[in-house]
Every structure is written in C-alpha cells, then in structure tokens.
C-alpha cells in the first residue's frame, strides 16, 4: 500500500493543494530574504521532489514543451511535478462566485495573469440574484485587474480564445475549456 502522490499528506495538513503551494512559495521567499540578510534558517519541512533530469536531446511532444516552457524548463515528462505559470485563466458566472470567495479568503490583491470573467451562463434571463452577482463579480474582477465581460458579450470560450497565442498555457472553470492554439486544462 502506498499513497500517491507523495505530497498528499502535506496537502491534507495544509487544508488543500492550493494552500500547500502558497505556503511553499511564501516559505521559499522568506528563506531567500533571510539568506540575503545573513539570517540562519532551517530547511522547510515540506519538500517536493525536483523533476528528474532529462537527458541531453530528450524529445518532447508539443504539449510537454508548452507546459515545460511555462514552468521554466525545456519540457516535462510523465511523473514530473511542476507549477507552470498560466498565461490565461477563464472564469464563468456559475463558478465565478466560488472563485471570488477563494480569492477573498486568500486576501488576493491582484491577478498574477490575465483573468477573464464572463457572464455567458446567466445572461439570457437573469434572476434578480444573478443580476446582483453579475454586477458585484464584475466590480471584483476589475478591482483585481481582470477583464470582466458584460452579460450578452458572448460565450467565454469564443471571447477568451481571442486572447490566445501559440505558446499559451491556460485553464478555465468548466469541463470544456479548450484553446484553438497553445494548451489548456479544464478545471471543472
């Protein structure tokens, strides 16, 4: 019996994978700052294995190259753990409320990448609570530097895909997010 991935216990203790990733990044920045100031530190308790070295001339598929580039590597192989920087994040109105709640709990002050919020699922005949969400969610997204489309502007995939470049890595808050170029990962 083995637990896969190796980080699952740490993810549980941290309250989830996102919190573990944030904790590791904060810890790494704090350690770097302490080293610059000459302050002695201990190694962090939670470490994930570094990607195994790839041999010189290792062939990669286009998808492996795109994800690797977004993670600062020439490519990735099956079993590698990487944290690629997404170029685009799509959000739609039915999941946007949960996204806002998570970001508020994390005290987010701005988006790290291009964030596009659409209102394509409730635009046709919004109930009064939908209209309120459309207004308040758009204000929230704009305040954090994202792009909030207006109700009736169209479907997120059509509008969002206009922002894609061939090397982009992105994600969207539903099961059918896909980019016509680049690579995308559905989050729903």
Q: What spans do the regions from the language model cover?
A:
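Fe-S-dependent hydro-lyases/dehydratases of central metabolism
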Residues: 1-188
């Amino acid at each position: 019996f083995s637990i896969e991935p190796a980080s699952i216990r740490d993810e549980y203790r941290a309250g989830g994978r996102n919190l573990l990733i944030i904790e590791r990044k904060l810890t790494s920045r704090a350690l770097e700052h302490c080293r610059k100031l000459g302050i002695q530190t201990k190694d962090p308790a939670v470490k994930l294995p570094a990607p195994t070295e790839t041999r010189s001339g290792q062939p990669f598929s286009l998808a492996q190259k795109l994800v690797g580039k977004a993670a600062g590597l020439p490519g990735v192989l099956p079993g590698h753990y990487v944290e690629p920087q997404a170029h685009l994040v799509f959000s739609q109105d039915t999941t946007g409320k949960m996204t806002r709640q998570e970001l508020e709990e994390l005290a987010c002050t701005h988006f790290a990448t291009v964030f596009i919020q659409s209102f394509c699922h409730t635009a046709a005949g919004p109930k009064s609570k939908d209209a309120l969400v459309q207004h308040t969610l758009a204000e929230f997204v704009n305040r954090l530097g994202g792009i909030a489309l207006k109700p009736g502007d169209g479907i997120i995939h059509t509008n969002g895909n206009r922002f894609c470049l061939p090397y982009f890595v992105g994600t969207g808050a539903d099961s059918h997010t896909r980019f016509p170029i680049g690579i995308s990962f559905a989050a729903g």
